[in-house]
Amino acid sequence: MSKRKRPEELRSHRWLGVSDLRAFGHRARLRQGGFDDADFSGKPVIAIINTWSDINFCHTHLRDRAEDVKRGVMQAGGFPVELPAMSLAEPFVKPSTMLYRNLLAMETEELLRSHPIDGAVLMGGCDKTTPALVMGAISMGLPAIYVPAGPQLRGNWRGQQLGSGSDAWKYWDEKRAGRISDAEWAELEGGIARSFGTCMVMGTAATMMAITEALGMALPGASSIPAADAAHPRMCAAAGRRIVDMVWDDLVPQKLLTPAAFDNVIRVHMAMGGSTNAIIHVVAMARRAGIKLDMNRFDEISQEIPVLANVRPSGQFLMEDFFYAGGSRALMAELSSALNLSCLTVTGKSIGENIAGAEVYKPEVIHPLSDPVSREGATAVLTGNLAPRGCVMKPSAADKRFLRHRGKVIAFDDYNHMAREVERDDLDVTPDHILVLKNGGPKGGPGMPEWGMLPIPKKLLKQGVCDTLRISDARMSGTSYGACILHVAPESFVGGPLAFVRTGDEIELDVPARRIHLHVAEEEIARRRAAWKQPAPRYPRGYGALYLQHIGQADEGCDFDFLAAPGTISEPEIH
């Protein structure tokens, strides 16, 4: 570890430690808040970036947990300041939280840049919050540690364990098919989300919390602690203590984020059976760190690493069970032969040291490499004339008969068109048809909404059909499942081949060969392209207009072009 900083080398010293009029004003304002020299003089100023809000129930507890972080910071001799940031509540933010991920990343970076901050504790968990916080922290380059919100408790309905998201989709289809009543549906509504915390299946929230720990940005085991468990506030206090030492040691993200660390992330993602959304976020995070990472690397590792976590939607159990089985440390220990164990983490130790001694207590929940949940990798990346820059699928959550399939297309121009058609009892559809949704991508959605798990047509549900092949340039919730081809790039809105697919065309999918092909002659595709007109942009002004002008495609991580690479970290002048 490098030589420890002296107090006068702290970034906050420029604001608080010098003898001039500006520093006088800064210190006077701190005294206005009831603080004196013993609170802040010569101490690291630690920002607690808190994404709590009244409408984000994944983060309800973060208001109190921030106090635990402050307790830890003060125990270690730091001065904590809580800075509220945008809270991306997945259920409530429309049209999509993905539209605002980069805005929160920008806010995080600028909060840290514009204030007298020496280090940061990043508090979040709900889906896009985690990558946004990490992306902003990477770009700012200050010591930072991530505090995951943690999963909620198991859902329950009439003695059955429920998984948020996954069972909502399942029982909604049952209701559409007429197999459960309105009264039963109302009971489900009251039992599927029983505590604060993130979705308790292996959705995007659980995936991103776990892989941020695997990246080395969180304390060992932190990502799998349930939000309501007493271990959670203890972890928060420990993170507060640790960030102070990280500041003195100048342990910045750039010292942790190496190509080997990102390979660890992808391996853990595959072993967890993680959300397809993570691919977009990890690519964006890597590029912020100056590491070129593309979807092909995910596919290479997917073919090496099987699924070990028997957690819904790819498995049977829930995140609470995963915690009792040993949690993230146990899974990484089981996977240790495939990990780069020398990678440095926020503890100042290697990931190998962090997972030493971890055990699997419930092998039915965390399987060994010798007996995985699925030998098929968690994610497959496909290319072909329909997706020249790639698309993704989660084979572990799909009906295996669709891994090789050729069928006729039913194409929908937008979400509303699709939503009307799938409810028709007279829709001309069979289980072999392929449903194609256009204009669900980064610009077309806009914000690449989670529309990719298209509803199974009601006509098929009534026949007992549980899965059908669906293709879109949208994303799907990590809690979703089924034979869904996602993230088709380039998207239809910008003239990608998906824009030219028509009802009656045939598409062929071969997941083992990693190919997807539209069986339409090149001449006909060219004719359709010439006749195509781009849809009108949704936003003429404001943040939406900025987003549409600068957003990248799915294979690029959907970052803004002016943020997607590291640059000189500018410091403000103090006048």
Please describe what each predicted stretch is.
Residues 113-133, 144-149:
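A short, small-residue-rich loop immediately preceding and capping a beta-strand
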Residues 100:
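Glycine-rich phosphate- or other oxyanion-binding loops that anchor nucleotides, phosphorylated ligands
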Residues 2-54, 58, 65-86, 91, ...:
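Catalytic or ion-coupling anion/metal-binding cores of large enzyme and transporter domains
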